[in-house]
Amino acid sequence: MSKPPRPNWIEDIPIYRQLMELVVVRILDQIYLEDKMLPSVRQLAQDCDVNPLTVAKAYKELAREGFTDKYRGEGLMLRKGVRDILLRREKTRFMKEEWPVLRSRLKRLGIDLRTLAETFND
């Protein structure tokens, strides 16, 4: 399996937060699977070209949110059901934060639902 591309960091957001979001995206995209080990701190740090302490902080926050279990000497494993939880959370966030902006822009541009739906077939 090929490596996912390195992220482009946003200057105004702490890197550990962006790493958390990266892990969430990779869970949703099923790159990281439930009941499987996450990449080691060193591996993810190397893949993303960041300090291992930054990855450790991101992993600590994910554990605090209840998404992982730590196995001494082995690493972190994603808990069963995490993807469904994250999917619900991301859908809710999209509908509250992103959809109203997108909907407003579609209206402004005169793009109706039929036209929008046709683009999904491309």
Where in the sequence are the language-model features?
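Short hydrophobic/aromatic-rich motifs at helix boundaries and adjacent loops
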Residues: 12-13, 30-31, 46, 73-76, ...
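Short, cationic-aromatic polyanion-contact patches
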Residues: 16, 40, 76-91
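A general secondary-structure boundary signal
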Residues: 52, 60-63, 76, 113, ...
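Beta-hairpin "wing" of winged helix-turn-helix
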Residues: 31-32, 36, 63-73, 79-80
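Extreme N-terminal segment that seeds HTH/winged-HTH DNA-binding domains in transcriptional regulators
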Residues: 1-37, 43, 93, 97-122
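N-terminal helix-turn-helix
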Residues: 37-69
